[in-house]
Regions:
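Short, structured surface patches at the beginning of a domain
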Residues: 1-158
């Protein structure tokens, strides 16, 4: 009787695919302006994003699951530049391969400088294979219609 190599058996076994897990960073930011609304508070942003994650994970038709790696926050920091301790710590974790998904309440919490924000969303994060989700803007960078959603990003970043 001929021997069958194990490698051939592995190729014929039917594999049951698991649901991929996105290791996510929750990023929240609040500048200290007198006109900041209560709806923008750090706690409110975190709660909103966690509710989104819970609802997403409960969906039986989901293509991936979201697991929170850490919460990164910048209190009292402007969104017009990216020189923020919480943001830099998050990006260090992205570079270390600990995170492959970033969730924010809306684009303006990520950054208000259109050019730099666009650079992150269009070049840096895609190059690093990092999914970006803006909850209130209904934006997911891995969605098929992500390119069509850029207009809402452009409008929400206008700082008057």
């Amino acid at each position: 009787m001929a021997r069958t190599a194990k490698r051939y058996k592995k190729n014929t076994e039917k594999k049951i695919p698991g649901i991929p897990v996105c290791m996510a960073a929750i990023y929240v930011r609040l500048s200290v302006d007198s006109d900041e609304k209560k709806s923008e508070s750090i706690e409110t942003q975190v709660t909103l994003i966690k509710e989104f994650i819970q609802k997403h994970n409960e969906n039986p038709d989901k293509e991936y699951e979201i697991a929170v790696y850490d919460i990164y926050s910048d209190l009292g920091k402007t969104g017009t530049n990216f020189d923020r301790p919480g943001f830099e710590r998050m990006m260090n974790d992205v570079r270390a391969g600990k995170i492959n998904c970033i969730l924010v309440k809306d684009f303006s919490r990520f950054g208000r400088n259109y050019i730099e924000t666009d650079n992150y969303l269009e070049k840096i994060l895609p190059f690093m294979k990092v999914r970006f989700i803006s909850v209130c803007d209904n934006y997911d960078s891995f969605a098929p219609d992500a390119k069509n959603q850029e207009l809402s990003m452009n409008l929400s970043l206008i700082h008057i």
